Amino acid sequence: FLPAIAGILSQLF
């Protein structure tokens, strides 16, 4: 799981 994707999900949710 890429940290970059986690950052985007944090902003969406």
UniProtKB/Swiss-Prot annotation:
Coiled coil: none
Tissue: Expressed by the skin glands.
Record's keyword terms, sorted: Amidation, Amphibian defense peptide, Cytolysis, Hemolysis, Secreted
Organism field: Pelophylax lessonae (Pool frog)
Entry-annotated residues carrying Phenylalanine amide: 13
Keyword Secreted in annotation: yes
Protein name, entry field: Hemolytic protein A1
Role: Shows hemolytic activity.
GO biological-process terms attached to the record: defense response; killing of cells of another organism
Magnesium in keyword set: no
Localization per record: Secreted
Gene Ontology cellular component terms for the protein in this record: extracellular region
Domain of life: Eukaryota
